[in-house]
Amino acid sequence: MKGLVLSGGGLKGAYQIGAYKALKKLKYDFQIVTGTSIGAINGAFITAKQYQKAVTLWENAQIDFLFTEKLNENLIVLEYIRNMIENKGMNVEALKSNINKYLSKKKFFKSEIKYGLVTVNKKTLKPKYISKEELNEDNLVDYLMASSCFYPVFQSKKIENDEYVDGGYHDNMPIDFAIKLGADEIIAIDLEAIGIRKKVQGKAKIKYIRPNNNLGPEMIVSNKQIRKNLCYGYNDTMKAFNKLEGKKYTFKKNELEKYLKFYKDKYEQLARKKKKDYQLTKEELRRIIESTCTILKIDDTKIYTIKKINNIIKKQVEQKGFFKEELKNINKKKITFAINDKIALYISII
């Protein structure tokens, strides 16, 4: 059976929903979903087959979407510290209300998908692995909150007579839980966030999807970053399955190979004129293009053709005067082949 495992990672979690969009496009059906912290919340929406509701929840995320108290966004770290001292953490009942608003419990329990989450008993520090069969409509959202309570930044979650904290304190990527539920083929979406990693003990074919770009802080609410993370998740997943290419930037499939043939001779001939024995490979072409885009601060969420990105590069260089000295040096036969000189050489042939 196919399993989807979602790590914890706070406000980086939109990445997982973007990744799931790609998996849907690739016709992946999962029989098992497990998650920790934000991964547990995302996993509940996926189990309920409410992908679009999850997107809406993330796109609407603002500071008051999470916290009951009115906070100064510019001093959010100080607000966290103040609440840790005065209130034993932030009150996140607003998040609970919004999960209740968007997540259909009926669809969750009607779904044939097996589900599991992880939380930790605050007093005993023992983990609690909870499967769908142990949940009901009354306690589902409470346990989602328990798995996500990043104590002491957030208040712990009391359920019946026990208090619970974030499952990431024990198992931030519950792969073995998915195997226990029956998964033998797993896609694990790793936010590379703070949390305990367990060495996988069970046997399963595992494919990891990890971010190529910076997803921003785990605890700072930025709607702009959230929307970027949705794109990053989609792009990285399509790259992981060889449907797109690139690393920090994203290009349509086979674009780099196509343009390598077009530029290779020109680039190497010009390099030889500068007395540099230089070979242009596909990987080096990618690195030069992406380095250029990074310096020029070109949008890294979009999917480009090389022709399109070259036009943007040329326009930016003309308008802003980037690499002016390096381009002059090429004309004067002064070239070191530091990355900026490689970029200038590339710009001169596109």
Predicted features and spans:
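Patatin-like phospholipase
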Residues: 1-36, 44-350
